Amino acid sequence: MPATCPDIAGPRMEIELITTGTELLLGRVLNTHQQWLGQRLADSGHTLSRQVTVPDNGQAIREAVQTALGRAGLVITTGGLGPTSDDITRGMIADMLARPLCRDDSIASHIESFFERRNRPMPESVLVQAQVPKGAVVFPNEHGTAPGLAIEVSPNTFHESGKPAWLLMLPGPPRELRPMVDDQALPFIKKHLPLEQAFHCRTLRSLGIGESMVEDMLLGQLKPLMDRGLDLGFCARTGQVDIRLSGSGPEMPALIAEAEATIRAAIDKQIYGTDDETIEQVVVGRLIATGETLAVAESCTGGLLGHLITNVPGASTIFAGGMLTYSNEMKQILLGVNESTLAQHGAVSKEVAVEMAEGALAVSGADHALSVTGIAGPDGGTADKPVGTVWLGLTSKGSRPLAIRKFHPYDRETFKQATVHQALEMLRRRLQKTG
């Protein structure tokens, strides 16, 4: 069923995001907050209206926050809440709103125990994070020391009508920000800034079909539902396309269900999951459900396939292990690939991919084994095997081995990502047939 939020009254408001950090503007750190927060807010029925990045400069932050409060009902800042000299957001906003900073003993205790649990000495300077603007709502940080803060700006002297607004300050590190948003900030927003009507959304995740083809196949079929209020969106990633169905109102669950049925009738084979599911989560989940195990043999992906699998909780029950065989010699020693096969066909070939998978299956005793061997570039390609060529192998107990050739003409990192996703999709389809 589509995700929903409570059907409670209240206007939809402008939301602005201010990311702070000189390192973001210098390009030393990738700013992922806008994409991630934008998606999370959209999935809950809210939409970012503006986003700006400012340096760790008090005047720049002040001007950005004041300008945003003059337009928006919710302003979110990220970063600048830590203990170092360039973490100035908390103090600057407290001064701007004439809110004195007050010590919060519960935060101080959390910071002290944070260091004690790690058996590390605590610098006294970190306790500055326990100073919060008077009247602020505190979001405890379970993954760090800087709490998130929410302040109601009422009256809002920066807005021409004095209309109240909320200001949310969130920590900068993604590993701290993301769980805080999911567990605390989004529930807070739903409570204090409710939507006019219940919002519903559903995302279908596909792999192995291009965005243009998906749109051409679906747009005409879904137009009658869109005319009745359904919002349809496509988001292309490397080798993948997300199809997002959303909207508000009592009729929307039925419209989304009808749209999903239409989409599945057209491209069900390519749909691997829904909403936030990843291909690795789907594959690991199915293996757990069937009680089967998996081994991998990697060359050009450098261990990324095993890395993605072991990122999934519960993978230890199904993952037998992985072998990283970059050189021909290691392919022979660890996987038993025949020297004659390598000499006749080359390392990037159907035959070697099959022997790698068969070797991984034999060594590990697993039920399934995946293999990848390819040319990531920028060098090493030939006319017959250009850079981007990759062979994927799959063998399973009781089944004939399978190998497929793919072509991913990207930079090395993107090549590796596309390759491991295709390998996992290869296994997913086999599991789907035998399940």
What are these regions (language model features)?
Residues 38, 42-67, 103-144, 330-367:
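Glycine-rich oxoanion-binding loops at beta->alpha junctions
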Residues 155-239, 246-248, 255-256:
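Accessory alpha-helical/coil subdomains and C-terminal extensions
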Residues 12-52, 56:
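Glycine-rich phosphate/diphosphate-binding loop of Rossmann-like nucleotide-binding domains
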Residues 15-17, 167, 294:
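Conserved hydrophobic helix-helix packing surfaces used for dimerization/oligomerization
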Residues 20-22, 77-85, 171-172, 248-249, ...:
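Glycine-rich beta-strand-to-loop/alpha-helix junction loops that act as flexible
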Residues 253-435:
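Short alpha-helical segments enriched in small residues
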Residues 60-66, 70, 87-192:
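Proline/glycine-rich low-complexity loops and linkers
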